[in-house]
Amino acid sequence: MSKNKLSKGQQRRVSANHDRRLKQRADKPEPDDNLFGEVRDGVAISRFGMHADVEDADGSVHRCNIRRTIRSLVTGDRVRWRPGVEGGATVKGIVEAVHERTSVLTRPDFYDGVKPIAANINQIVIVSAILPELSLNIIDRYLVASETLNVEPLLVLNKTDLLDDEGREFVDEQMEIYRHIGYRVLMVSSHKKEGLRELEEALIGRVSIFAGQSGVGKSSLLNALLGLELGDEEILTKDVSDVSGLGQHTTTAARLYHFPHGGDVIDSPGVREFGLWHLEPEQITRGFVEFRDYLGGCKFRDCKHDTDPGCAIREAVDKGEIDASRFVNYHHILESMSEVQAKTRRSFSADKE
């Protein structure tokens, strides 16, 4: 996702941090090339500082150093790497290069502007639930992120076992808003394991992330799909400590897991709760897919799509061609973005002083 233009002060901060990291890396000697074998392809399944866990084609995982020339490497990156020669290198391998990404998930970062956190994702599973509450506003936020990334979204409503007939009818009406504009919706229960087979099929052949507000059961759902009988947070430490003994670093590091039925998932707290703060208003507008046919049809080129005279989108809402709740959420998102961006600017200014 693209970012807002940084102020000169922010640009200086980003540049200074990058230069500092380059100097730190330059102070450390590169490993001897003779200690490593032939170059091969792999996937970065997690990263810890200047090391990455790289999975080879045979499924084996290798803790690798990262060349200083590599500016950015995140979970999901396809890489070129070399294994350590047995009895020679003190590390299992070294990452030489990163292949071009098909997509990259980012989040705002106070020091570096925008920070990549996962790469090559092709599906965002947007998880919601009737508890703590069904929030269409949050669903719409994640849909905007998906559309901006050009990554296919999948809407999953969890905890459906808690619905009575009346509640199920209400929820189905709400979900019809999204089905009507072309989104796929699945109703599941991780507790009762209902609807999981259909969800498993939707994950095959995909690199997915699971996103949604706290309390909707993302971790429980992932554990059920991965075949784990673990607590909500233990997914973030399983396998990493088994592979490298570095489980203490995994609570914030994104990691790629394989579903037993096929498909992959990249998971971490940062991945689950990425935001929209670094988007432009025009990107938010285009992120509402049903608005697109009306863009360019407004009377004024700088139309805010609110109370402006001759607004084609507003007229479509009045005619029932665009759902009114989506239109309201669109403006809520714009307002909240403005508030967050203003707060961020104040933080930068205060820090500068």
From Swiss-Prot:
Residues 102-274 form the CP-type G domain. It is found in: Cytoplasm. GO terms for biological process: ribosomal small subunit biogenesis. Monomer. Associates with 30S ribosomal subunit, binds 16S rRNA. This is Small ribosomal subunit biogenesis GTPase RsgA. Its cofactor is Zn(2+). Residues 1-36 are annotated as: Disordered. Keywords: Cytoplasm, GTP-binding, Hydrolase, Metal-binding, Nucleotide-binding, Ribosome biogenesis, RNA-binding, rRNA-binding, Zinc. Zn(2+) binds at C298, C303, H305, C311. Belongs to the TRAFAC class YlqF/YawG GTPase family. RsgA subfamily. Residues 1-14 have a biased composition (Polar residues). Binds 1 zinc ion per subunit. Residues 16-31 have a biased composition (Basic and acidic residues). GTP binds at N158, K159, T160, D161, G212, Q213, S214, G215, V216, G217, K218, S219, S220. The lineage of its organism: Bacteria, Pseudomonadati, Pseudomonadota, Gammaproteobacteria, Enterobacterales. One of several proteins that assist in the late maturation steps of the functional core of the 30S ribosomal subunit. Helps release RbfA from mature subunits. May play a role in the assembly of ribosomal proteins into the subunit. Circularly permuted GTPase that catalyzes slow GTP hydrolysis, GTPase activity is stimulated by the 30S ribosomal subunit. The keyword DNA damage does not apply. The gene is rsgA. GO terms for molecular function: GTP binding; GTPase activity; metal ion binding; rRNA binding. Its EC number is 3.6.1.-. It comes from Erwinia tasmaniensis (strain DSM 17950 / CFBP 7177 / CIP 109463 / NCPPB 4357 / Et1/99).
